[in-house]
């Protein structure tokens, strides 16, 4: 009798398929790996594995997540990982059934994203610019301030995912570039326009990095990345940028918990829609494959339409 493949082996095969056939990126693969590792550890505790777990065991795992205090969004994500895994195992004939097919997830309403006001974003931009222009700052401190200001300007101008932003190549800062090519989820490319402020911020930051290369005290070396670092990836990490952004929020008089790279991406989309942008255009700029993902912002469009009717309809005052 042939031995059952281990959970680790099946996880590896599944992740290889996601990378090869669906173009899943490192962040997506890491998320699946974490979720499936947790699921595997639960199965091990109850004497099962991916290869022999039944539907009731999967239900027990979902109940365990609830007992451990996981939010409904996190439970739904784990369930999605399980469904994808067992569909793969069925297609590969590793299993003859799909125990996750009839599972139902937690009911959850999709919450509206937190949105910073235009005034809040402007406060952060002004503070970041002030820090980048501080004359008494050391060369290394000024370079970090210029980097943060550049990151903020580009993020609010483009609405990039944070993973796309920190991994921009150095070539994105070409002189007079009006558009940048962004490699997004599934390795798909899209063109995103830059405004004058973001282009200038990139030019100033790039000039500072060029000057810093000759200064050994700054530790700046040649790199293909626009925002290089000495870490394994070679570029600034999402976590580092998020931490810097929260510090900037506090320095701008805002609550750190209300600010993140993702919140600024939401601000980009919401502010565009509030000012009349078409939902399909915003979908393209955000890199959403499905319009339903972008439709979370329709509350902004609805409020604007109500305002237009209230302010412009000839009988609105009667």
Swiss-Prot record:
InterPro entries reported for this sequence: CB, DNA_brk_join_enz, Integrase-like_cat_sf, Integrase_catalytic, Integrase_recombinase_N, Integrase_SAM-like_N, Recomb_XerD, Tyrosine_recombinase_XerC/XerD
Keywords: Cell cycle, Cell division, Chromosome partition, Cytoplasm, DNA integration, DNA recombination, DNA-binding
Residues in Tyr recombinase domain copies: 111-310
BP terms from Gene Ontology: cell division; chromosome segregation; DNA recombination; DNA transposition; resolution of DNA recombination intermediates
Listed GO MF terms: DNA binding; tyrosine-based site-specific recombinase activity
GO cellular component, one term: Holliday junction resolvase complex
Matching Pfam families: Phage_int_SAM_1, Phage_integrase
Record domain Core-binding (CB): where: 5-90
Protein name: Tyrosine recombinase XerD
